[in-house]
Amino acid sequence: MGSLVFRRPFCHLSTYSLIWGMAAVALSTAQVEVVTQDERKALHTTASLRCSLKTSQEPLIVTWQKKKAVSPENMVTYSKTHGVVIQPAYKDRINVTELGLWNSSITFWNTTLEDEGCYMCLFNTFGSQKVSGTACLTLYVQPIVHLHYNYFEDHLNITCSATARPAPAISWKGTGTGIENSTESHFHSNGTTSVTSILRVKDPKTQVGKEVICQVLYLGNVIDYKQSLDKGFWFSVPLLLSIVSLVILLVLISILLYWKRHRNQERGESSQGMQRMK
């Protein structure tokens, strides 16, 4: 006599509870989000950082901190109870310019090198839950570029220098053979870097009338600075030296002739005076 076998799906309540619990936690975590945006501003200008909390729970207090190597440093807090509270080290430097518990903004009135870095905004909600976001501030200084050239007896120097923050890079376009290139960098106390590149042309006559291009790479952009080498400048230097030498020679000859003539006149007058006395 055969036996009947009944199969039914296995269902364990603890397993389903665990799955649903994990899903609920993931869903609640996904609903809490802090939206931030990094900023890049010019040095010694006004800069603002903003945080937005995306949750239905009402925050109790918003705290801004600066990230440091050892531990974050408290800067300012805002709450409905106490309003804006700025730490002594940041007074007259920053303020909360957007007063809100879901949206908060801090503003640096005159950015300095110390203000560059990353900042955390912490939202304390009911139940002592803390949610944070990070926004970074980067400061820059636009490039100041100088391009010029100098002729020497046996070579030509073409110099291109750029000062900026962060450090720029220099390259050349339109150069030929027989040219040496040297580049050096100098760091300044104001956070900028000067990069100087010098082209040394062994035969200057080959570059007269041509155009050289100094290319400055800065923050992903390349800017061309053009310089045309004066066509007549190289030949005018020897000519000018010859003219100056000739003029000096003529002046010396004129002085010598005048001196001799004046001396002869004095001798003649002296002889006539002696004859009259006799």
From Swiss-Prot:
Effect noted on mutating Q57K: Enhances binding to CD200R
Subcellular location: Cell membrane
Stretches assigned to the Ig-like C2-type domain: 142-232
InterPro entries: CD200_Ig_V_dom, Ig-like_dom, Ig-like_dom_sf, Ig-like_fold, Ig_sub, Ig_V-set, Immunoglobulin_dom, OX2G-like
Gene name, Swiss-Prot/TrEMBL: Cd200
Record bears the keyword Plastid: no
Pfam families cross-referenced by the UniProt entry: ig
Protein name (Swiss-Prot/TrEMBL): OX-2 membrane glycoprotein
Function: Costimulates T-cell proliferation. May regulate myeloid cell activity in a variety of tissues.
Lineage of the organism: Eukaryota, Metazoa, Chordata, Craniata, Vertebrata
Organism: Mus musculus
